[in-house]
């Protein structure tokens, strides 16, 4: 496990804002059962990776999705957890001390989703939740597609239109993308394997969907 600083100035304002609210962000998603919902999703939809896979959590925040990946994947993989907010990355790194035995599987990096510090076609899986809403959608998906190997996968958890989605936009200062635009931009590089609506009785179902797509 290591901590690497590779931030760029682009979108620095978003990173600075999250530096200030990292604790609020972490508390919000822990209270609403986000982690449990991810566990249930991964149990029903096993991730398409094998031993030694190279995985990126793009926009990892305080590490909730990173932890869900570690719980879902029982064999050794290499995960990079990247976020623009240094405070969030440090919080995510510290939280992993409560996951003994898996620390070596994760590298924490402060960096920019629009300028990823990875070679072309070098990753097997990219997961992202709550990050593409801060960047032009086409630019974000283009950059994620650049680093995913042919046959690799993208798991995207976009915000879908809802009153809760509007509230989250105001609270966390992002702008969600229309579902049709998300689908169209994704299909420029990927074949959509499935789209999933989280159950409405789960808090995550009020604002998020899941899209798994394979690079063609």
Q: Would you name each region that the model predicts?
A:
Residues 138-150:
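A short glycine-rich, Lys/Arg-flanked "PGG" loop and its adjoining helix->strand segment in the class I
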Residues 127:
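A conserved beta-strand element that flanks and buttresses the S-adenosyl-L-methionine
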Residues 159-174:
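Short, glycine-/aromatic-enriched active-site segment of Class I SAM-dependent methyltransferases
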Residues 152-159:
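Conserved beta-strand signature within the Rossmann-like core of class I S-adenosyl-L-methionine
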Residues 191, 198-216:
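Core SAM-dependent methyltransferase catalytic element
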Residues 1-49, 64, 68, 100:
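Conserved class I S-adenosyl-L-methionine
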């Amino acid at each position: 496990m290591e901590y690497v600083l590779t931030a760029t100035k682009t979108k620095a304002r978003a990173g600075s804002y999250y530096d200030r609210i990292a604790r609020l962000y972490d508390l919000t998603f822990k209270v609403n059962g986000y982690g449990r919902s991810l566990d249930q999703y991964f149990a029903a939809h096993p991730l398409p990776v094998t031993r030694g896979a190279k995985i990126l959590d793009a926009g990892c925040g305080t590490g909730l999705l990173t932890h869900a990946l570690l719980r879902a994947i029982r064999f050794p993989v290499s995960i990079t957890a990247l976020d623009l907010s240094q405070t969030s990355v440090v919080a995510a790194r510290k939280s992993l001390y409560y996951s003994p035995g898996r620390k070596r599987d994760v590298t924490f990096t402060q960096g920019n989703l629009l300028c990823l510090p990875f070679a072309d076609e070098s990753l097997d899986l990219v997961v992202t939740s709550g990050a593409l809403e801060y960047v032009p959608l086409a630019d974000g998906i283009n950059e994620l597609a650049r680093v995913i190997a042919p046959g690799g996968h993208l798991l995207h958890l976009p915000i879908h239109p809802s009153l809760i989605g509007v509230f989250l936009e105001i609270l966390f200062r992002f702008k969600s993308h229309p579902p049709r635009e998300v689908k169209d931009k994704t299909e420029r590089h990927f074949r959509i394997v499935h789209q999933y609506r989280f159950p409405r009785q789960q808090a995550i179902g009020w604002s998020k969907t899941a899209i798994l797509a394979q690079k063609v």
